[in-house]
Amino acid sequence: MKACAKVDAEIFVVDNNSVDGSVEMVQKKFPAVKEIANKDNKGFSKANNQAIQLSTGEYVLLLNPDTVVEEDTFEKMIRFMDAHSDAGGLGVKMIDGSGKFLPESKRGLPTPRVAFYKMFGLSKLFPRSKTFGKYHLSYLDRDKIHEIDVLAGACMMIRKTVLDKTGLLDETFFMYGEDIDLSYRITQAGFKNYYFPETRIIHYKGESTKKSSVNYV
């Protein structure tokens, strides 16, 4: 809530049928939050779409519950989007709980060739190669702003007018892959996705969601 102190924001929490008292806790401690309590697990895409459809802001920020942001993260992201009219989506530098950089902060489009290089370890062997390192764009400086192909669903800011053109998250993706699909549609609509490392977030479950399985790739 502190991160929204200087931002005109509406906050939605979508609960996918949790059983740990989260719904009641949010209602009690954060009465200003608009909560959607689902009776079953709708999946990532559908749950986020529920909130997006109710949102009224110029920008939409999708943010996982296992993240921690800096107090000025949202301000910096909004300033960047305001200054770059070509930006359809924006992602930030993500680190895990130990402070380690999460490579999924910036990704290329996982074409069959790019996915092959990742699955067979070539991207790890040659991270600085523009040929083999495209999956995580590992040849790009992690401390500089870059145009990228794919935003991470854990934290992605999207211009609302762009969503009007691309459509919302594809609900045929229950979990994983929906961020790739939407990122691709953003670029196909003529906008750019940017990696913005001038602020960072902690993503505690980043290591468990590296999505390195063959099914995901």
Language-model segments: residues:
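Short, acidic, metal-binding catalytic loop of nucleotide-sugar glycosyltransferases
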Residues: 1-8
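A conserved acidic beta->alpha catalytic loop
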Residues: 7, 15-24, 40
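Short, flexible, basic/aromatic active-site loop/helix in glycosyltransferases
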Residues: 109-148
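Active-site-adjacent helix/loop segment of glycosyltransferases
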Residues: 95, 184-217
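Short aromatic/hydrophobic "clamp" motif used to bind/position activated sugar donors
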Residues: 60
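Glycine-rich, basic loop-to-helix element that forms the pyrophosphate-binding segment
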Residues: 37-55, 76
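A short, conserved alpha-helix in the catalytic core of glycosyltransferases
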Residues: 141-200
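Conserved donor NDP-sugar-binding/catalytic core segment of glycosyltransferases
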Residues: 71-105
